[in-house]
From Swiss-Prot:
Gene3D superfamilies: 2.40.50.580, 3.40.1350.60. This is Sugar fermentation stimulation protein homolog. Belongs to the SfsA family. Pfam families: SfsA, SfsA_N. GO terms for molecular function: DNA binding. The gene is sfsA.
Length: 235
């Protein structure tokens, strides 16, 4: 996935009100940019980090710049724009880069499904195969050992998605929880039961019901992002 134009850079001053971020530009001026991430962003938003941002062509936006990447003091690159996770996975599936999903012919996004009135991130179908429902989650929480975790805060929405995926699997269709790892320092992924015990319990039930967990990492730069490797996952 290539950005429309090469990202510009600045230095993070602060993130506040969840969706706003102040940065200092190379000319020492300051600018407020949009942060499309409502999560905790633990370790991703430290003052002094280098940030990269895109510029929207929509002239009606109050904040036309969007925070895309962050570079930590350990030189790890993180994508903080959660919208990119779905785009990356869709591109990888279309390009036949996800081995487990290469046999599907048709792809749709944001399809309504489930008893709790949800929308699935990605829906795949093909003749002679069960329909495939894919929920995408971005992983950016890292500890000092290279272990990545999801979620980074309690997620009632994520719990709902697990219940929906479990129901899909129990009905004989293919249900996939896809972790898109958007932190270059993460080497493996597990569930943060110390943060959200209910999510952990629901995922155990989901796996027992037949939900598949996939975990792939992206490489990121100011010009493009691309899913490149599969990472180990343990519950």
């Amino acid at each position: 996935m290539k950005f429309e134009a090469k990202l510009e850079s600045g230095i993070l001053i602060r993130r506040y009100k969840r969706f706003l971020t102040d940065i200092k530009l190379p000319d020492k001026s300051e600018r407020t940019i949009h942060c499309a991430n409502s999560g905790a962003m633990t370790g991703c938003a430290e003052p002094g980090n280098t940030v990269f941002f895109s510029t929207s062509s929509n002239l009606k936006r109050k904040y036309p710049n969007s925070w895309e990447l962050s570079v930590t003091e350990h030189n790890h690159t993180i994508c903080v724009n959660t919208i990119r996770a779905n785009q990356l996975v869709v591109e990888a599936i279309i390009n036949k880069e996800i081995d487990e999903l290469v046999n599907y012919a048709e792809l749709k996004t944001e399809v309504k499904y489930g008893s709790e009135n949800s929308r699935i991130d990605i829906f795949l179908s093909a003749e002679m195969l069960p329909d495939c429902y894919i929920e995408v989650k971005s992983v950016t929480l890292l500890d000092e050992s290279g272990q990545g975790y999801f979620p980074d805060s309690v997620t009632t929405r994520g719990q709902k998605h697990l219940r929906e995926l479990t129901e899909i699997a129990q009905n004989g269709q293919k249900a996939v929880l896809f972790f898109a790892v958007l932190h270059s320092g993460i080497e493996k992924v597990s569930i943060a039961h110390h943060i959200d015990q209910q999510y952990y319990s629901l995922l155990l039930e989901a796996i027992e019901s037949g939900v598949t967990v996939l975990c792939y990492q992206a490489e990121m730069s100011p010009t493009e992002m691309k899913i490149v490797r599969k990472l180990p996952f343990s519950i």
